[in-house]
């Protein structure tokens, strides 16, 4: 935990946060069918009000995953502060088989000790399933809450938690000298800061696998160009600025390659650059449009959008050569896919019956499930553990970000108050 906090602190110490109206989650569909769990407000052992609602952070994280339905605070049968105070029978009577309790205690040096316990109230009543204590300063209290969420989530599901991750996205503000901004925030919209401002459009942010850099498209030179920016010091390196279109960057999971789309020869095709040498080679050819690459976990195969059959569909191709294979067949068109880190599923924009929604496809069975119910949905991006999807949709005259769990149980909106928000990209584990 201490190492994780040091990494996070160094990440932000090198970037002074720029204050904006932050993107915050508003629930649009709950998770009544998910696993019930108790999350008790953490006891505050200091004077006045608690500096942060850690219990609320943990409950929100678990709810956002779609896998848990935290019991409403008004229905809690008791509010214990420690594992010893938990009365298992009171919880099991409500169908709750696990309860999170915790404490926040100020330390003499001005920091805070955040402690949690995950208590079994079902199979082995009273057993502590997981526990930890973190010492953090006030700025990192939310991070401590997300860390507790990650540990609780993994203990109960066997899936690594992704609540300490971040999202990058583009905001178009109303007027000003630099109306386009590339921003980064925690996955839930808190701790937002600006990476880059521009008088011209910014598009398609993509994270390096270690989370230290972002690739994106800029038009500041008068035409599209692909750049990579280091988050720790702001250094920008241009990697592609060919005639016509340069876009849709995507780093391979092993970090050795960057895929993108170019139209320098007329048709829009996929290319792959060796990150170390800068050498670029063409992957697709022909007169069709081939774009929006996303990597499979082997760092050798790409899923991408192509209109070679008339309408956009998702295909798979090996970057070392071979014939692309179509992998989407349901709906009138499918595009802008994102493959999960285990390679078993992908999310995409799927159109059918005049509707454009986010859908999930099982890459083994081919089964498709529509996840979203918003309007003109686009640019889905998966959490690194594959449990949540962030995407943009149209609302009124603008665009907002939305969150949906990959089982479709939980849906939320992240409304922006100072501009249109689009092109979200979920970070790797940080």
Swiss-Prot record:
GO terms (BP aspect): cell division; protein import
Cell compartment(s), UniProt: Periplasm
Pfam families: PD40 (PF07676), TolB_N (PF04052)
The entry's keywords: Cell cycle, Cell division, Periplasm, Signal
Record's GO cellular component terms: periplasmic space
Coiled coil: none
Organism superkingdom: Bacteria
InterPro entries per UniProt: 6-blade_b-propeller_TolB-like (IPR011042), PD40 (IPR011659), Tol-Pal_TolB (IPR014167), TolB_N (IPR007195)
Signal peptide: 1-21
Function: Part of the Tol-Pal system, which plays a role in outer membrane invagination during cell division and is important for maintaining outer membrane integrity. TolB occupies a key intermediary position in the Tol-Pal system because it communicates directly with both membrane-embedded components, Pal in the outer membrane and TolA in the inner membrane.
Family: Belongs to the TolB family.
Record note on quaternary structure: The Tol-Pal system is composed of five core proteins: the inner membrane proteins TolA, TolQ and TolR, the periplasmic protein TolB and the outer membrane protein Pal. They form a network linking the inner and outer membranes and the peptidoglycan layer.
Protein name: Tol-Pal system protein TolB
Organism of provenance: Enterobacter sp. (strain 638)
